[in-house]
């Protein structure tokens, strides 16, 4: 009996002495990496589509809690940026989602603007708002400033309720000498002032995501997006930096305090929310909106929520993401719930991360969804026939 006990104890001691590796050899569980691991790391990036194993709560939001004004769309626009949807079907879709109004930003001017007004604005009162734009083909005309003021007046008389400026200002529009037109170019001053006189807002897209100004390489967090759209890259000496562009923009904001500006895409730099907050503090004539920046904001939910809570009177709901119902429902989930680690709505892929819900309180939701936009458009002083 004493001999058997000794054998058992000796066996146990040997097992413990051998450590986890020794026991693993018997069970098939390993504690050392495979010697051929490096040779297996050859999966193509496009084929790497991991499915999260996280078991997180899911709260689907099929319909917004409060009526919504989407201030950033291009649906049935004059430029051809947005989705083409039959207006009657679009209204039915909006009703299902609790969307009160959508703003079509790229309406151009003249006959093209009139077509949108005749086909969408007039037949469906209150459901569609359309903006006008600059005609850059006239930039070299010595009377450019006066021509744009007259064009804005004509557009407003037709029914336009704002001016939209695409990112081409500062990045693409050039004069006859090849020189880029700066955002704070003095030739634009009369147009900004005219918008203030009429009480219509200027929605301006300045720069683009910060990653678009970085090299397209393995360190760029939006590599896949830029490979798909290399024309979205603004890296190189032929382009001004993001910092230079927002500096031009800020000089323009300061020069025209009586004009209301909306700094699209959450103030032009959502990767830097301290900068966005400084913009709002510095310029009382500036508002922001959420268009196409759910991904950027959703990955930094605590700081983003602070901005929403502190500046709840200055933020509007915008998408800039087509007209799909699932897209809208994803935005609603992001704003209304506290769900964790779920996909953002935008396509193409912006970056390999997930987002987190903000869980905004009702009073803030109402302002963001419709209250702030209603207050902005209520500043209209007349000048149109509609």
Where are these regions (language model features)?
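Bacterial N-terminal signal peptides
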Residues: 7-19
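Mature N-terminal segment immediately following signal peptide/propeptide cleavage
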Residues: 54-88, 92, 370
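Acidic-and-aromatic substrate-binding clefts and catalytic sites of carbohydrate-active enzymes
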Residues: 76-85, 105-114, 137-146, 173, ...
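Active-site gating/metal-coordination segments in enzymes
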Residues: 33-50, 113-232
């Amino acid at each position: 009996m004493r001999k058997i006990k000794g054998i058992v104890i000796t066996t146990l001691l040997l097992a413990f002495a051998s450590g986890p590796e020794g026991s693993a050899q018997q069970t098939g569980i390993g504690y050392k990496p495979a010697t051929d691991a490096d040779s297996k790391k050859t999966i193509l990036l496009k084929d790497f589509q991991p499915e999260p194993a996280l078991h997180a709560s899911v709260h689907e939001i099929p319909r917004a809690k409060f009526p919504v004004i989407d201030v950033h769309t291009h649906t049935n626009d004059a430029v051809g940026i947005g989705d083409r949807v039959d207006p009657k079907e679009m209204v039915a879709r909006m009703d299902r989602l609790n969307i009160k109004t959508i703003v079509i930003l790229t309406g151009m001017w003249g006959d093209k603007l009139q077509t949108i007004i005749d086909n969408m604005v007039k037949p469906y009162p209150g459901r569609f708002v359309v903006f006008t734009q600059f005609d850059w083909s006239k930039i070299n005309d010595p009377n450019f400033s006066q021509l744009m003021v007259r064009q804005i007046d004509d557009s407003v008389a037709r029914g336009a309720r704002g001016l939209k400026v695409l990112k081409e200002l500062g990045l693409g529009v050039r004069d006859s000498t090849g020189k880029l037109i700066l955002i704070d170019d003095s030739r634009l001053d009369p147009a900004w002032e005219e918008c203030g006189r009429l009480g219509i807002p200027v929605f301006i897209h300045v720069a683009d995501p910060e990653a678009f100004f970085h090299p397209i390489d393995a360190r760029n967090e939006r590599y896949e997006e830029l490979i798909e759209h290399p024309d979205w890259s603004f890296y190189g000496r032929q382009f001004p930096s993001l910092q230079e562009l927002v500096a031009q923009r800020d000089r323009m904001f300061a020069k025209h305090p009586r004009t209301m500006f909306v700094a699209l895409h959450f103030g032009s730099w959502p990767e830097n929310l301290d900068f966005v907050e400084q913009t709002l503090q510095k310029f009382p004539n500036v508002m922001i909106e959420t268009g196409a920046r759910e991904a950027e904001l959703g990955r930094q939910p605590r700081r983003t929520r602070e901005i929403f809570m502190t500046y709840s009177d200055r933020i509007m709901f915008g998408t800039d993401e087509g007209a799909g119902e699932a897209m809208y429902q994803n935005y609603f989930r992001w704003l209304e719930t506290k769900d964790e680690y779920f996909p953002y709505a935008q396509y193409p892929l912006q970056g390999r991360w997930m987002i987190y819900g903000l869980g905004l309180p009702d009073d803030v939701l109402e302002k963001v969804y419709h209250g702030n936009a209603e207050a902005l458009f209520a500043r209209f002083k007349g000048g149109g026939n509609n």
